[in-house]
């Protein structure tokens, strides 16, 4: 765990590998200042820690999916982002156990619909400059607009609701094509 100051926006917490392959959980304490005046500061920090630990564990248990985040192939990277972020957001969502969340609230239904539109466009994109922007938007920006994060999370929530732990295990077994699976 590395506590630092000065990591580039928008990253307040990230999981990264050092040149020697060691995984680091990096938390920028200056970026955390924006959470200091919030009443639910403890929940936010717990969510950040849970989220980044999920990335760490994915890297440990599924190194191929972890390495794919650095792939030069656009669709492979989009699959890896959606996989990684889907699990991390599912497990850390609102500091709430996944079976205590109303995954079909009107807000989340609207979010899923909007993010699926963005995911469809991202999957169809072939222009390299637009692909770069889609990859950025997939995981950066306003919470509910990070389309890979939201599509992954809500797809996995559905797997949980319909198939339980077996559904999550099946989803975890293969990140290939994961972005497209979230549209089903």
What do the predicted segments below correspond to?
Residues 1-26, 42:
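Auxiliary, metal-adjacent structural segments of Zn-dependent hydrolase domains
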Residues 21-30, 47, 74:
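Extended, well-ordered protein cores
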Residues 60-122:
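Post-HExxH zinc-binding segment in Zn-dependent metallohydrolases
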Residues 44, 48, 83-90, 151-155, ...:
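Extracytoplasmic/secreted proteins, especially bacterial periplasmic and envelope-associated proteins
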Residues 103-184:
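Pan-zinc metallopeptidase signature
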Residues 31-49:
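Short pre-active-site segment immediately N-terminal to the catalytic Zn-binding motif
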Residues 48-60, 86:
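Catalytic glutamate of the conserved HExxH
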């Amino acid at each position: 765990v590395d506590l630092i100051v000065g990591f580039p926006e928008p990253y307040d917490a990230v999981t990264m590998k050092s040149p020697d392959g060691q995984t680091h959980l990096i938390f920028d304490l200056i970026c955390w200042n924006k959470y200091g005046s919030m009443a639910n500061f403890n929940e936010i920090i717990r969510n950040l820690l849970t989220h980044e630990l999920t990335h760490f564990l994915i890297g440990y248990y599924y190194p191929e999916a972890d390495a794919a985040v650095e792939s030069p192939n656009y669709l492979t990277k989009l699959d890896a982002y959606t996989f990684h972020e889907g699990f991390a957001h599912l497990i850390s969502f609102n500091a709430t156990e996944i079976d205590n969340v109303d995954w079909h609230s009107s807000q989340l239904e609207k979010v899923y619909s909007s993010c699926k539109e963005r995911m469809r466009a991202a999957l169809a994109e072939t222009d390299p400059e637009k692909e770069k922007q889609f990859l950025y938007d997939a995981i950066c920006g306003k919470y509910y607009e990070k389309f890979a994060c939201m599509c992954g999370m809500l797809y996995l929530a559905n797997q949980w609701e319909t198939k339980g732990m077996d559904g999550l295990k099946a989803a975890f077994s293969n990140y290939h094509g994961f972005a497209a699976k979230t549209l089903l």
